[in-house]
């Protein structure tokens, strides 16, 4: 069963075609990562799937009643506003303190509840955004470059957290990666986008695809770098595609 799909989707901005003939789908519990150069339409694709941007051609289909959690690429917060993390999670819908505390605990930052958003580190703020998205109990979690601005340990830790979210909640993940050569080892599929779908498949298949190499060069021997980590639990998905 498909949760969300694009069918020959095109998106235009004025006379410019940002996306052309894009088709993709996300199944339950699947982790799909979208990579592409700057200006390739990655963020536009997420916004079109969410219904924020209209389709110039083609269409988007969603399973009826699908609950989606969204972590945007950038969220500017006025540093002069007194807004704690706990209060932020209660906007616009008021949440019980216990619910807010549980959400922050779930993403590993229970200590930031009473801290001002402006005082949080980049990694802490991204986790607060994730906590907010998870409050809707999403069946599909959409993340737009969620690790941008994080250092490598912070990036790896956030990816581990995303895997844990999928494992514990069963949510599917559709994520845009800002780093052309870094993709989660847990990704079931990688979609290479440059205004259209250049290629897609497992991380290993995409890293060896001529379309990927033509776009991004050989970089780290032309291969996508895959974050790996030791597991003390079983996943139902296959990790055998580690590079």
Swiss-Prot record:
GO terms for molecular function: ABC-type zinc transporter activity; ATP binding; ATP hydrolysis activity. It comes from the Bacteria. Part of the ABC transporter complex ZnuABC involved in zinc import. Responsible for energy coupling to the transport system. It is an enzyme of class 7 (translocase). The complex is composed of two ATP-binding proteins (ZnuC), two transmembrane proteins (ZnuB) and a solute-binding protein (ZnuA). It comes from Cereibacter sphaeroides (strain ATCC 17023 / DSM 158 / JCM 6121 / CCUG 31486 / LMG 2827 / NBRC 12203 / NCIMB 8253 / ATH 2.4.1.) (Rhodobacter sphaeroides). SUPFAM superfamilies: P-loop containing nucleoside triphosphate hydrolases. It is found in: Cell inner membrane. It catalyses: Zn(2+)(out) + ATP(in) + H2O(in) = Zn(2+)(in) + ADP(in) + phosphate(in) + H(+)(in). Keywords: ATP-binding, Cell inner membrane, Cell membrane, Ion transport, Membrane, Nucleotide-binding, Translocase, Transport, Zinc, Zinc transport. One of its GO terms (cellular component) is plasma membrane. Belongs to the ABC transporter superfamily. Zinc importer (TC 3.A.1.15.5) family. This is Zinc import ATP-binding protein ZnuC.
